[in-house]
């Protein structure tokens, strides 16, 4: 029985091994073809096979089920996460935001800053829709915030947080802008500046100038705002803006309204707006007037309103300087200027009066001399010319009829304007002369009149003008030889010269001095006829002009000194002293 049982058991083991081998072969064949159906069939069949025998097939199959079921379950769990990656995005509408904030958020630099700080990508989408504009089927302007896989954000939670942080930053910027606007309006902490740039010409309403100014998709206005940071809005007739059409702006011409808190940004925006308006006017073939010249023009400087800058002040300065440098003012009446023109000129010593000669002023250019210290009046004459040549030159230049045209008022004003202190000042400054014969009234040659004339010329600079008019100067005081015959006009009848019977030859009856003194070489004084001045000078020099008759005993002494006088002429030391 035991053998039979053994024989019976052998076929059972053989059959089990054959069944296992066939099952493994079948499983290997069908695993790659239909894995889902095989697993379902195996999951149902394996529980029935477990109680059949205590073999190792069951433990070997359970890990297989686990290994095969895990890869199939993972795709089912990850499938909704892949769909969430596409949905992780947010949109923030900025179409109704303030213009400056709207353009700040749409700038590429602002969006790049948000991306660097949060990791989310911000993209501008939609189209700007003006207020109260009819819908056109497109979304209004908004920001699309997303977190893409290329940003190295592996987990979904990190991407969601990045999008939330970016949206929070944008919302915070919008809140701060609204708060700043409220503060600027209520508390006036920020002073808003605004200006207008007008089109400058009337365009045809059918030409749609407003669209040309805005540009395609408002690119021109956006460019100005992006470059300067100022707010630019198109307003006025034909602008298409419905915000303030009921107000005063609806009646204004077409213009760009520039506003901002920074003066520099306003200036830059105005410059760009002017260039834009100029370009539009060229396209329409119209001549445009700049906004600064017509609307809201800046007033010109005060210098341009009052005339040339500082012209009156400069003229006053010139007049005052000229008055300081001029030694004597000219106060002659208007009708005296035509007959006797005298031009005041500057002098080296403005504290002394100008001594102007009528003869020189009529014969040649007038050259004033101040105080007897300047020799500019003798340019070209002194000291090359001899005394005789000097006298001849003066006689040629002197013209007596000129005085007849001068009115008496001018003579009186001129004579009174000459100070009497000049003669005394000159006498004090000059050293005393040495005279050979102190007891004689005249220490010169036999003709005492000539000597008296030379003394008068040396001691005083001012003489009566009437004396110059009546008789020309005598050359006797300049040269020892007798005077030329050509310079001896008849003496004046109104004069009373002090003559002596013993004096030979008689000098010309004149009280005038020599026009050119060899001592100081001064220009001759003006020839004015004034009896009051003549009488005053006669009183001052009574001892010189009216000497007592010379007795005969003194004539011999005078003849005795003729020889020595020829050698020692009193005029010589005066010339060397000057």
From Swiss-Prot:
CDD domains, A to Z: KH-I_RIK_like_rpt1, KH-I_RIK_like_rpt2
UniProt-listed InterPro entries: KH_1_KHDC4/BBP-like, KH_dom_type_1_sf, PRP5/DDX46/KHDC4_KH, RIK/BLOM7
Domain (KH): residue spans on this chain: 206-273
Polar residues: bias regions: 413-425
Biased composition (Acidic residues): 560-572
UniProt keyword annotations, A-Z: Nucleus, RNA-binding
Tissue: Expressed in vegetative tissues.
Location relative to the cell: Nucleus
Region of interest (Disordered), ranges: 1-34, 413-578
Annotated transmembrane regions: none
Protein transport in keyword set: no
Superkingdom of the organism of origin: Eukaryota
Biased composition (Pro residues): 472-492
Any one GO MF annotation of this record: RNA binding
Covalent S-S links between cysteines: none
Residues spanning the signal sequence: none
Biased composition (Low complexity): 493-503, 510-521
One cellular component (GO) term of this entry: nucleus
Subunit note: Interacts with AS1.
Entry-linked PANTHER family: BLOM7 (PTHR15744), KH HOMOLOGY DOMAIN-CONTAINING PROTEIN 4 (PTHR15744:SF0)
Name under which the protein is recorded: Protein RIK
Organism: Arabidopsis thaliana (Mouse-ear cress)
């Amino acid at each position: 029985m035991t053998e039979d049982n053994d024989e019976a058991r052998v076929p059972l083991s053989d059959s089990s091994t054959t069944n296992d081998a066939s099952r493994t072969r079948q499983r290997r064949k069908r695993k790659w073809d239909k894995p889902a159906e095989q697993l379902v069939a195996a999951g149902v069949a394996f529980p029935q096979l477990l109680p059949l025998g205590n073999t190792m097939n069951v433990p070997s199959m359970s890990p297989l089920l686990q290994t095969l079921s895990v890869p199939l379950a993972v795709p089912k769990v990850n499938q909704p996460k892949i769909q969430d990656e596409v949905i992780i995005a947010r949109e923030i509408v900025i179409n109704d935001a303030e213009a400056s904030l709207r353009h700040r958020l749409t700038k590429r630099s602002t969006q790049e800053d948000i991306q660097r700080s949060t990791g989310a990508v911000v993209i501008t989408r939609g189209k700007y829709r003006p207020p109260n504009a009819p819908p056109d089927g497109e979304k209004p302007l908004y920001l699309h915030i997303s977190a893409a896989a290329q940003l190295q954000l592996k987990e979904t939670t990190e991407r969601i947080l990045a999008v939330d942080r970016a949206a929070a930053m944008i919302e915070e910027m919008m809140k701060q802008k609204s708060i700043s606007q409220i503060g600027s309006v209520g508390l006036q902490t920020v002073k808003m500046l605004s200006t207008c740039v007008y089109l400058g010409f009337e365009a045809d309403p059918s030409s749609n100038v407003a669209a040309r100014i805005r540009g395609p998709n408002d690119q021109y206005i956006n460019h100005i705002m992006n470059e300067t940071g100022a707010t630019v809005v198109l307003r006025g007739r034909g602008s298409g803006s419905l915000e303030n059409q009921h107000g005063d702006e609806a009646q204004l011409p077409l213009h760009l309204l520039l506003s901002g808190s920074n003066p520099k940004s306003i200036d830059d925006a105005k410059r760009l707006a002017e260039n834009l308006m100029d370009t539009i006017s060229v396209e329409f073939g119209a001549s445009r007037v700049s906004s600064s010249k017509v609307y809201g023009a800046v007033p010109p400087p005060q210098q341009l309103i009052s005339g040339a800058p500082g012209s009156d002040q400069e003229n006053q300065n010139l007049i005052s300087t000229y008055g300081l440098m001029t030694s004597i003012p000219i106060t002659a009446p208007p009708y005296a200027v035509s007959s006797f023109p005298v031009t005041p000129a500057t002098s080296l010593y403005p504290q002394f009066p100008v001594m102007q000669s009528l003869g020189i002023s009529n014969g040649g250019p007038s050259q004033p001399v101040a105080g007897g210290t300047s020799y500019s009046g003798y340019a070209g004459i002194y000291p090359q010319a001899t005394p005789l040549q000097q006298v001849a030159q003066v006689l040629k230049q002197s013209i007596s009829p000129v005085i007849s045209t001068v009115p008496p008022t001018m003579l009186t004003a001129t004579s009174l304007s000459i100070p009497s202190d000049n003669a005394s000042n000159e006498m004090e400054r000059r050293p005393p002369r040495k005279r050979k014969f102190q007891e004689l009234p005249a220490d010169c040659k036999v003709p005492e009149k000539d000597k008296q004339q030379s003394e008068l010329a040396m001691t005083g600079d001012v003489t009566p003008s009437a004396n110059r008019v009546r008789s020309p100067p005598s050359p006797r005081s300049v040269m020892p030889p007798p005077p030329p015959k050509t310079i001896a006009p008849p003496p004046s009848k109104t004069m009373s010269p002090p003559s002596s019977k013993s004096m030979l030859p008689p000098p010309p009856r004149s009280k005038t001095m020599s026009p050119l003194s060899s001592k100081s070489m001064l220009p001759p004084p003006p020839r004015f006829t004034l009896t009051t001045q003549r009488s005053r000078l006669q009183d001052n020099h009574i001892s010189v002009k009216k000497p007592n008759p010379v007795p005969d005993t003194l004539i011999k002494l005078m003849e005795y000194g003729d020889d020595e006088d020829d050698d020692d002429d009193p005029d010589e030391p005066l010339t060397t002293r000057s």
